[in-house]
UniProtKB/Swiss-Prot annotation:
Record protein name field: Cyclic pyranopterin monophosphate synthase
Active site: 132
Enzyme Commission number(s) from the entry: 4.6.1.17
Molecular function, one GO term: cyclic pyranopterin monophosphate synthase activity
Catalytic reaction list: (8S)-3',8-cyclo-7,8-dihydroguanosine 5'-triphosphate = cyclic pyranopterin phosphate + diphosphate
PANTHER family assigned: CYCLIC PYRANOPTERIN MONOPHOSPHATE SYNTHASE (PTHR22960:SF29), MOLYBDOPTERIN COFACTOR SYNTHESIS PROTEIN A (PTHR22960)
InterPro entries: MoaC, MoaC_bact/euk, MoaC_sf, MoCo_biosynth_MoaA/MoaC, Mopterin_CF_biosynth-C_dom
Keyword tags: Lyase, Molybdenum cofactor biosynthesis
Pfam families: MoaC (PF01967)
Binding site for substrate: 79-81, 117-118
Recorded metabolic or biological pathway in which this protein acts: Cofactor biosynthesis; molybdopterin biosynthesis
Subunit structure, as described in the record: Homohexamer; trimer of dimers.
Alphabetical list of NCBIfam families matching this protein: moaC (TIGR00581), PRK09364.1 (NF006870)
Amino acid sequence: MSGSIDQLSHLDAAGRARMVDVGNKAVTAREAIARGRVVMQPATLQLIVSGGMPKGDVLAVARVAGIMAAKRTAELIPLCHLLNLSHASVNFTPDPAGNALEIEATVRCTGQTGVEMEALTAVSIAALTIYDMCKAVDKTMQIDGIRLIAKRGGRSGDWQREESA
C-alpha cells in the first residue's frame, strides 16, 4: 500500500476528519461496480435458489435492501456525500461449486464525486440481508470478498480490478 497522510482527502492538515469539498469538481458521469459473496451450506443455497426459505424470497428482499442501501449511503458512512443516483442494481449468481451466492451491484450518477461507496454499501447490505434471512437454517454462513471491481469517470479516470479466474 502506497501513499501518505497528505493523500488522505478526508483529513485536514491537523489530521481531523472532514468532508471533502467537491464544489469545484466537474460534473461527469460516474459508475461503480462492486462484488461480494455469501458462503453457505449447499442445502441453504438450494433453498434460496428454489424459493423455499421459510422467511420468503431471499433474493427479492436482498435486492431491494441493496438498492435502498445504495440510496442511503450518505446516512450510513459519515463523510460520504449525498448523491442523486440515476441507477442502482443488485444481481445474484449462485455458485454451487463454491457453495456461495455471488452478489454484484452497479451504481451510476452524474455528479462531482464517485459512487464507489454506494456500490460497496449495496453489496454489503444485500449480503447482510441474505445472512439475516437464512441464519435460522445455516449458522455457518460467511460474508466474504466485498470489493470494488470497477469505477468509471471522475478526475482519477477509470479503474478496473484484475481478478484471476
